[in-house]
């Protein structure tokens, strides 16, 4: 597929409880269309949940978020775009369960780590006008 | 809707069965049950996730609090019927280092 002909799906999601599941339902349909495996589909859904929750929570904005799925023959690209104040992705600490147990440490903070583990590539672009997370899942050849 | 569909006791175990998205709300329901049962000197729990096929890290983080509570009492948390993506998520987080995991409830009860 050339760039001009890549099909895409766009979602606009309000910051409301459990609305991340709207994104995962869409991802399930796209994964089936692309004939991705159950494993790949599950990984995409989980990463998307975390990315959407992060956009909800960290954008410190009540503005809707946008999710764009771009389908190609060999990979799915997903952009999660918020209109918040932006953040420094390099400043995110890698969580460790051993240190979270017994140290009165906040138990949360796993989202970015999970996204990076579950997807093939992850990139953040952030400014004062918002953050765009771009993540891809390559289709395995079985 | 996310909810606990059953809580029962078998031998030394408290079995908690959930349904739906394992999010913050469901995690808080589970930890409430654990806190209540710990007051009754029940320290061994099995969480049956057969009807919960999807999780988020906030719900999973509450399970870290559950583990913390049970470690203080020499208790255990076992997980069964995990969907593959839930098992993978918990493994990435390191949760499965601190839980026993089983394919079925019967296997969890027989541990």
Give the location of each predicted region:
Chain A
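Short beta-strand-loop-beta element adjacent to the nucleotide/active-site pocket used for signaling
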Residues: 71-78
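Flexible, glycine-/charge-rich segments associated with ATP-binding catalytic modules
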Residues: 1-12, 100, 116-142
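Conserved ATP-binding N-box helix of the HATPase_c
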Residues: 38-63
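Glycine-rich phosphate-binding loop
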Residues: 104-119
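A conserved short beta-strand within the histidine kinase catalytic ATPase domain
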Residues: 63-70
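Glycine-rich/acidic phosphate-handling loop/turn and adjacent ATP-lid/helix
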Residues: 78-107
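Short coil/turn motifs at secondary-structure junctions
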Residues: 74, 83-85, 140-142
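Bergerat-fold GHKL ATPase/HATPase_c domain
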Residues: 1-46
């Amino acid at each position: 597929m050339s760039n001009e002909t890549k099909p895409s799906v766009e979602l606009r999601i309000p910051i409301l409880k459990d609305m991340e599941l709207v994104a995962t339902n869409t991802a399930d349909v796209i994964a089936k269309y692309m004939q991705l495996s159950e494993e790949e589909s599950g990984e995409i859904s989980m990463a998307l949940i975390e990315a959407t929750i992060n956009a909800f929570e960290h954008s410190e904005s009540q503005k809707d978020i946008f999710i764009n799925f771009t389908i190609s023959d060999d990979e799915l690209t997903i952009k999660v775009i918020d209109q918040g104040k932006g953040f420094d992705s390099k400043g995110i600490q890698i969580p460790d369960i051993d240190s979270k147990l017994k140290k009165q440490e906040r138990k949360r903070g796993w989202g970015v780590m999970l996204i990076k583990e579950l997807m093939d590539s992850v990139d953040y672009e952030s400014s004062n006008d918002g953050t765009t997370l771009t993540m891809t899942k390559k289709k395995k050849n079985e | 809707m996310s909810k606990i569909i059953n809580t029962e006791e078998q031998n030394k175990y408290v079995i908690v069965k959930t349904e739906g998205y394992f999010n913050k709300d469901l995690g808080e329901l589970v930890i409430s049950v654990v806190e209540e049962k710990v007051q009754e000197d029940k320290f061994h729990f099995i969480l049956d996730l057969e009807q919960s096929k999807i999780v988020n890290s906030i719900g999973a983080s509450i399970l870290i609090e559950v583990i913390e509570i049970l470690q203080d009492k020499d208790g255990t948390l076992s997980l069964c019927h995990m969907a593959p993506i839930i098992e993978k998520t918990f493994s990435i987080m390191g949760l499965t280092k601190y839980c026993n995991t089983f394919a079925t409830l019967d296997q969890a009860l027989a541990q």
